[in-house]
């Protein structure tokens, strides 16, 4: 274990990467474009499968962003987690409709598997194979041992629930129980004997599905009894990357709402003149800064090989979930009546935050986990 740097956050390389991502999303992923893709009049039928720009995803792959944290030996770039955090933050700020965050989560899980088959799958991700996790049971449990899928003779049977970006993904990393415990398995989205059923969710920039397996062929990534350990090892990175996306989305909401309160006139004064508006916006800013510090600290502790990575990551996700609810609700409220309409861009980011809020456990769930870690489980 190495000592964590006192000045954690972005180095020169990560700062350049963040600036590059900011310019890319500004040029190619404006709120107006996103609104045109995903927002429709609710009286008109809207497909529950998210509309997204596949050519833009290919550009992301060509920029090397899917490979950023993958080890060089597996065909990646081999940068630290903070590099992916820099990209995820800007992706959240753009509400980028893509399987990027889901693919990062799968990447960290595959890295934790540390097997030849997992390394090969990482190389495929580096070249653009979108991959997502299918690890949740019907009850929505995020525990690594809870799965409704079983494996017998190398074939999967059962249902994986709440699979993120399932309709955009080429592959699934599936947790399944066997005689000797939970293992992890790779399944192609086009494989026989699987059925991907899209679910409706609040977030307009993502899709979600449940996947049924009926003796589906799979490739073992982590042996029975090792799959849950790989998921546990990857969870700090997963929580950190989701929290980074929330930071970016929160910053967009704050910036947009602040600008609106400068131009919206009420009682012959800009809306931002009134303390009832000023003070909550300052609190949102402080909430975002606290979250950002915890996210950067979490990423840095993971990169430095600290022993308290889970503690840091759950602190970051707990704060990020609280920030998401507060920042997005204030953004809607301060936009007034227009904020509740389909014409307003704010609701797209609001809904992304509400989805992120519960993804891999909301603030209450994270604090319960933290209490168990710090105080100990109740008898």
For each predicted feature, which ranges?
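Short, flexible active-site-proximal loops enriched in glycine and acidic residues
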Residues: 94-103, 221
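Structural signature of FAD isoalloxazine-binding scaffolds in flavoprotein oxidoreductases
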Residues: 78-87, 142-145, 187, 215-217, ...
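Alpha-helical interface subdomain recognition
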Residues: 1-94, 113-117, 128, 233-379
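Flexible, small-/acidic-enriched active-site or ligand-binding loops
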Residues: 144-147, 162-164, 189-222
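Cytochrome P450 C-terminal beta-domain/meander region
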Residues: 143-157
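A short, Trp-centered hydrophobic/proline-enriched beta-strand micro-motif
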Residues: 127-138
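A short core secondary-structure module
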Residues: 159-194
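Short beta-strand-to-turn element immediately C-terminal to the catalytic PLP-Schiff-base lysine
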Residues: 110-115, 174-177, 186-189, 212-214, ...
């Amino acid at each position: 274990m190495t000592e964590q740097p006192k000045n954690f956050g972005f180095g020169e390389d990560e700062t350049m990467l963040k600036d590059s991502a900011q310019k890319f999303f500004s040029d190619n992923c404006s709120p107006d474009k996103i609104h045109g893709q995903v927002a429709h009049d609710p009286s008109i039928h809207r497909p529950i499968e998210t509309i997204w720009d596949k050519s833009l995803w290919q550009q992301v792959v060509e920029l090397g962003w899917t490979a950023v944290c993958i080890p060089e030996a597996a065909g990646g770039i081999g940068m630290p987690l903070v590099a992916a955090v820099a990209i995820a933050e800007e992706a959240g700020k753009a509400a980028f409709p893509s399987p990027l965050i889901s693919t990062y989560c799968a990447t960290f899980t595959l890295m934790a598997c540390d097997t030849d088959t997992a390394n090969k799958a990482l190389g495929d991700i580096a070249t653009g194979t979108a991959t997502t996790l299918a690890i949740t049971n019907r009850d929505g449990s995020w525990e690594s041992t809870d799965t409704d899928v079983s494996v017998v003779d190398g074939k999967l049977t059962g249902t994986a629930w709440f699979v993120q970006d399932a309709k955009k993904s080429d592959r699934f990393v599936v947790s399944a129980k066997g005689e000797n415990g939970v293992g992890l398995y790779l399944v192609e989205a086009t494989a026989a004997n699987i059925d991907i059923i899209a679910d409706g969710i609040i977030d307009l920039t993502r899709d979600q599905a449940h996947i049924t397996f009926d003796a589906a062929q799979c490739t073992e990534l982590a042996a029975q009894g090792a799959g849950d350990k790989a998921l546990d090892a990857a969870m700090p990175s997963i929580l950190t990357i989701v929290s980074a996306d929330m930071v970016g989305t929160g910053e967009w909401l704050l910036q947009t709402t602040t600008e609106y309160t400068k131009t919206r006139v009420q009682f012959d004064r800009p809306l931002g003149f009134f303390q009832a508006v000023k003070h909550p916006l300052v609190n949102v800013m402080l909430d975002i800064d606290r979250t950002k510090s915890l996210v950067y600290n979490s990423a840095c502790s993971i990169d430095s090989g600290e022993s308290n990575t889970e503690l840091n990551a759950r602190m970051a996700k707990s704060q990020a979930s609280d920030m998401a609810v507060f920042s997005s609700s204030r953004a809607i409220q301060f936009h007034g009546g227009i904020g509740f309409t389909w014409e307003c861009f704010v609701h797209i980011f609001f809904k992304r935050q509400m989805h992120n809020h519960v993804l891999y456990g909301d603030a209450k769930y994270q604090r319960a986990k933290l209490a168990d870690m710090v105080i100990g489980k109740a008898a």
